[in-house]
Every structure is written in structure tokens, then in C-alpha cells.
Amino acid sequence: TSNMLHQAGKIRDLSQVDKYCDWLENLEYDTLKLPRPNKVIFLDVPVEVSMRLAHERAGLKANTQKDIHEQNPEHLLHAYNSGKYMCQKYGWTRISCVENGNLRSIEDIANDVYNSVKQDINNYENNN
């Protein structure tokens, strides 16, 4: 799923994004028989916040080197937008990790993740 998000972020034409995603799903789940996830959770951190956090993290570590995607803000923005699109296209759960421009606490985010998964488990149990 992260590969789908980053690779789709390189494609500008939405119909081509859909075509790529269909191809990748076929490859991973039908051809390679990889297990299909029951749930995907997109931890939504806007690009400006993630870049600020990466910059702060780099300031704390003298020899921190950004990965190839962190070095390219335009790619980060396109990948982020792809993530939001994938939430709509595939029904991924989107959890906002930022409130008023600041990262929410780990505990708050974890509670949202837990409650989302718990709700899915309860729905499954009630339907079986």
C-alpha cells in the first residue's frame, strides 16, 4: 500500500493512477498471491507538518540524511494527495494526526487506530 501511494504520486493523470493501481493490485494479490489487507489506515499528516517535523528531527541528529522522498517536497505533496485519493478509492481509514497545525499525541492517535480496528472487529462479530 505504501508502494502504491508513492508510485501513484509520480503519476499526474488520474485515469493513469487508476490504471496503475489496478495493475499493482492484480500483480500483488492475484499473480503473486500476497495477502490482501483487511484494513488500511492512512495516518494523515499534511506535508507542511511532516516536513517541519523532519527538519526538527534532522536538527537533533547531526548526521541525519533524508531519504530520496524526503528530499523532494513536490513528491511528498503528490504522494500525500495520492494517499487521500486512495482513502476514497479503496475505503482506507483516514486518521488525522494533526490538530491546529500540531501533531496530536501518540496516545490520541493510537486510541483512534484502536477504536477503528475495534469497530471493524465488532462489526465482523455481529455479522457472523
Annotate each predicted stretch with a short phrase.
Residues 1-2, 92:
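Tryptophan-centric aromatic hotspots in well-structured domains and transmembrane helices
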Residues 2-5, 101-103:
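Short, active-site-adjacent cap segments at secondary-structure transitions
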Residues 3-81:
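A glycine- and Lys/Arg-enriched "phosphate-lid" helix/loop adjacent to the NTP-binding pocket
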Residues 48-128:
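NTP-dependent small-molecule kinase module
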